[in-house]
Curated annotation (Swiss-Prot):
Gene, per the UniProt record: purA
Family label: Belongs to the adenylosuccinate synthetase family.
Any one GO CC term of the record: cytoplasm
Comment on bound cofactor: Binds 1 Mg(2+) ion per subunit.
Residues making up the signal peptide according to the UniProt record: none
Catalytic reaction list: IMP + L-aspartate + GTP = N(6)-(1,2-dicarboxyethyl)-AMP + GDP + phosphate + 2 H(+)
Enzyme class: ligase
Biological role stated in the UniProt entry: Plays an important role in the de novo pathway of purine nucleotide biosynthesis. Catalyzes the first committed step in the biosynthesis of AMP from IMP.
Name of the protein this chain belongs to: Adenylosuccinate synthetase
GO aspect biological process, one term: IMP metabolic process
Length: 432
């Protein structure tokens, strides 16, 4: 038995929700360890759809413990609203099935406002990142700047006032520079005191809780958000998120040591998508790109934004295999490729006349690379709902085997529809 870390191996939207839900049935505890409410997913359980963006997937399954780790930035209003939506669907959320790290950073209204103001200003100059405007980046900035308000601060109103003064010294200076009104001390104090009683019951010393559970032999599933190519260090900077999204963050963002992580499962879409700005070497701006987007329902859960679509990029996924230490992948949305006469896979790039096998870190170089493709025969038969290799067309199996060879990692799970049971299990990550 081992613990499992789930990471996206591309730019997010790889289908982590279904796989995490499938794995969470086998887990005792599901832990979010980075990001905020900027990446959503939909779970379908017994015909009911649950849309989650901040809460770990385990919260909707009876008998499971959901944990929000210290690496997550928590918008308390988004948290309360999401709990309310789940309760309206009959899901009970209490400290018996949700814990939040007392040292997790809070997202405040001033973070959301700053995020939006920066994006608006950048839009006018053509340099926008394409954030969700939910305050994620500014909250992480305050965390690193040692001025953040954390969950535990809600329990100590005597010291909270001084911490609010500290954060406002920084933010009001920025607001003056941007030509907008300053935020008053009382506004932030009222904002925090109004939600304290709703958030504090979930507060816990999460690293200690998880350590005790690990020693008891509990199965722990670490649920990543976004994808490895959006990592603040290893992604396509500056078109990235504001946290580390690679598997190593599961240790830092939960308070558990790296030796506790176990199997690293990389969720990998059978083609490539990206939402927002940034380089995308295999992007298809033609009828095939439209086909993938429409058949794959490629619209963001949180923002509703249309995703850009392209061919599978083995060079990029190979990088993610390395930066995450991925043990095996879950290949998703194979069924979206049904009906295409031929398929292409990117195996490397041409950069200034030279072939390279990885995407360079330089923003300028990323903009100049041209993909190098191999072409495979497609298949006409349907793969929808396949639950064994015998159900797959020969060419689909060949495609999967080619992906394995090019990325240097085996397929542990193969998903053939949004339904959780339409999954071919090759290796159970918890039993590895």
């Amino acid at each position: 038995m081992t613990n499992v870390v789930v990471v996206g191996s591309q730019w997010g939207d790889e289908g982590k929700g279904k796989i995490v839900d499938w794995l969470s049935e086998r887990a005792d505890i599901v832990v979010r360890y980075q990001g905020g409410h900027n990446a959503g997913h939909t779970l379908v359980i017994d015909g009911t759809s649950y849309k989650l963006s901040l809460l770990p997937s385990g919260v909707v399954r009876p008998g499971k413990m959901a944990v929000i780790g210290n690496g997550v930035v928590v918008d308390p209003h988004a948290l309360i609203a999401e709990i309310g939506r789940l309760e309206a669907q009959g899901v009970t959320v209490t400290p018996d099935n949700l814990r939040i790290a007392d040292n997790a950073t809070l997202i405040l209204s001033l973070h959301r406002e700053l995020d939006a103001m920066r994006e608006d200003a950048a839009s006018n100059s053509g340099t926008k990142i394409g954030t969700t405007r939910r305050g994620i980046g500014p909250a992480y900035e305050d965390k690193v700047g040692r001025r953040a308000i954390r969950v535990m601060d809600l329990a100590d109103l005597d010291s909270l006032a001084g911490k609010v003064d500290r954060i406002l010294t920084h933010h009001n200076a920025l607001r003056r520079g941007l030509g907008v009104a300053e935020v008053s001390h009382q506004t932030i104090m009222d904002e925090l005191t109004s939600i304290a009683d709703r958030v504090l019951p979930f507060r816990d010393t999460v690293w200690l809780f998880l350590d005790k559970e690990r020693r008891k032999g509990s199965r722990i599933l670490f649920e990543g958000a976004q994808g490895s190519l959006l990592d603040i260090d290893h992604g396509t900077y500056p078109f990235v998120t504001s946290s580390n999204t690679v598997a190593g963050q599961a240790a830092a963002g939960s308070g558990m040591g790296p030796g506790s992580l176990g199997y690293i499962l990389g969720i990998t879409k059978a083609y490539t998508t990206r939402v927002g700005e940034g380089p995308f070497p295999t992007e298809l701006k033609d009828a095939i790109g439209e086909f993938l987007g429409e058949k794959g329902h490629e619209f963001g859960v949180v923002t509703g934004r249309k995703r850009r679509c392209g061919w599978f990029d083995a060079a990029l996924v190979r990088q993610s295999i390395a930066t995450n230490g991925i043990t095996g992948i879950a290949l998703t949305k194979l069924d979206v490729l049904d009906g295409l006469e031929e398929l292409k896979i990117c195996v490397g790039y041409m950069l200034d006349g030279e072939q390279i096998d990885h995407l360079p870190a330089s923003q300028g170089a990323q903009a100049r690379v041209e993909p190098v493709y191999i072409t495979l025969e497609g298949w006409k038969e349907s793969t929808v709902g396949a639950r064994s290799w015998a159900d797959l067309p020969a060419q689909a199996i060949k495609y999967v085997r080619q992906v394995e060879e090019l990325i240097g990692a085996p397929v542990a799970l193969l998903s053939t529809s949004p339904e959780r049971d339409d999954t071919i299990l090759v290796t159970d990550p918890f039993e590895d």
